[in-house]
Amino acid sequence: INTANPSPNSVNSSEFCAKYERNIAETYDVLEIIANGPMFDVSDYISGAKKMKIDVYSPAVGIPIQITLEDSTTATPTNYPTGRHSEYIGVTTVANQWETVELVFNGQPDPSLSNVGITSIILLFNPATNTDDTYYFDNLMGPEVNGPCNGFISNPQSDFQDWDCNWNINFGYMSGQLLQSYNPAVGSVNTSKYSAKYT
């Protein structure tokens, strides 16, 4: 969920960040981040020429963080390693303060996948455990995306929020979750790929 930054510092001075409460019942509790378009060639991340990074506020030192680049059109919860292009691992080095964790290439579960056109980033905190820790994260930096917002210039005077390319306002609410979601019924009234979902 979107929440106030628990402790701004020089690493992450943002007013807001993501808050994630790990599900103790899940050994591999995953966060799926669907790119707003297919990813460009990710081979530089495999070779190490480019690095994935994420700002993390974690409860302990030594917690592994994993990113899996995935083709979500073929990957399902039960068919590992199909659809999992490559995995990257980083480890926390401080507790209860922001740090930038760098993730390095750790293998290719499904080497048959192309380096071009990956659709999703799967983010795992402390995988292969059953813990219920709380994490905060922000500023995920990784593969470039061939998305519809490339070259888009926002006009905040007329485009407040369309959940695709315009993000010009913040929302305050008392309960529930407000998320970006796939448009459930694309049509002539609303042709957007994404919309808001409130539960």
What spans do the regions from the language model cover?
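Beta-rich carbohydrate-recognition modules and glycan-binding surfaces
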Residues: 1-199
